[in-house]
From Swiss-Prot:
The lineage of its organism: Bacteria, Pseudomonadati, Pseudomonadota, Alphaproteobacteria, Hyphomicrobiales. It is a peripheral membrane protein. Belongs to the ABC transporter superfamily. Phosphate importer (TC 3.A.1.7) family. Keywords: ATP-binding, Cell inner membrane, Cell membrane, Membrane, Nucleotide-binding, Phosphate transport, Translocase, Transport. It is an enzyme of class 7 (translocase). Gene3D superfamilies: P-loop containing nucleotide triphosphate hydrolases. InterPro entries: AAA+_ATPase, ABC_transporter-like_ATP-bd, ABC_transporter-like_CS, P-loop_NTPase, PstB-like. This is Phosphate import ATP-binding protein PstB. It is found in: Cell inner membrane. Part of the ABC transporter complex PstSACB involved in phosphate import. Responsible for energy coupling to the transport system. Residues 5-247 form the ABC transporter domain. GO terms for biological process: phosphate ion transmembrane transport. The complex is composed of two ATP-binding proteins (PstB), two transmembrane proteins (PstC and PstA) and a solute-binding protein (PstS). It comes from Bartonella quintana (strain Toulouse) (Rochalimaea quintana). It holds the Pfam family ABC_tran.
Amino acid sequence: MKIKMRGQDVKVFYKDKEALHGITLDIPEHKVTALIGPSGCGKSTFLRCFNRMNDTIEGAKITGLITLDGENIYDSQIDVVELRARVGMVFQKPCPFPKSIFENVAYGPRIHGLVKSRAELHDIVEKSLRQAGLFEEVKDRLHEAGTSLSGGQQQRLCIARAIAVSPEVILMDEPCSALDPIATARIEELIDALRKDYTIVIVTHSMQQAARVSQYTAMFHLGHLVEVGATEMIFTSPKEQRTQDYITGRFG
């Protein structure tokens, strides 16, 4: 099993508050790794370390080592814009740009210089929308605003936007929390299909979702990594009592 990303002794501080306490976790390639735990446990903070989104928070400081294919992503020589293309992110609330459906997907490849012609750009947009399971629904309305889509469609548009710049890893921070059950099921099916081409890390509050979509699960509590393992093992025979208590609804 190849390790795509690795965090070693990762600590995150917000000014003088330590939010993560020395997290060490491997992210296997072409698998879905779910990060679970109660609100405020640090799972989203840890997720944002993987593409340096915490850099945008005033007073945030990260120590430890995080690597992508063995390369330290916090090295001073790293181009953060390029890193965020390689490690894409889908947020909790669908956030399409105030542009057309087509331009939402075309924007990334264009600014990253990934296309040489209009025809090539059209191909990337169509391929990305198809991978996100959205093309057939929007192919006759690509000129319409991305915000005109339903919530579930907007989230799939955001996934297409992330895919369009050919990432290696896709981070998802509770991507279904604002969606209805039908839209959630579509996203979950999509996640399972996408792992053939991408490595996925998902933060979720839904135990059922973590069990359905992931191959590996990591349990967080109060800024600590409680345990990590194959999802089936975590949900059927966890080693730690805190994991058992959380999964069975005794706290959270």
